[in-house]
Amino acid sequence: MRLIDYFPESSISVKPAAKNWQEAIDFSMSSLLQNHYINAAYIEAIKTSTVTNGPYYILAPGVAMPHARPECGALKTGMSLTLLKQEVQFTEVDEPVKLLIGLSAADADSHIGAIQALSELLCEEDKLSALLTAKSEKQLADIIARA
């Protein structure tokens, strides 16, 4: 599977801002919820885990991959991508986040290919910069489709 194949319809979005990290999580996971990749309990599990453990899913400056354990409400494996024009702070000590990659992993293995492809994409500085400065959903989708 190509990386873009993990993104269901309408799962790539650009938003002006989030009021707080909780709303950023909601933005990030809403298309996965609407497309029945997760249930509402999955989103609550991410928020609860963030309060308990901190934002363990911040991958790099400006980039987060919110997710929870499969048994918390993941129904199918898929991803979403939300770019915030104005970054949001998760904690006082962590870098603010601008790009959220929502992950639903239905089991321990089905998302490994997507994570590998995503890691390669994020390690290429020019592509990461292009994601962080994209102006539209189409630009974001084109970058992911070329990965």
Labelled PLM ranges:
Residues 1-147:
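Cytosolic covalent-transfer regions centered on His/Cys nucleophiles
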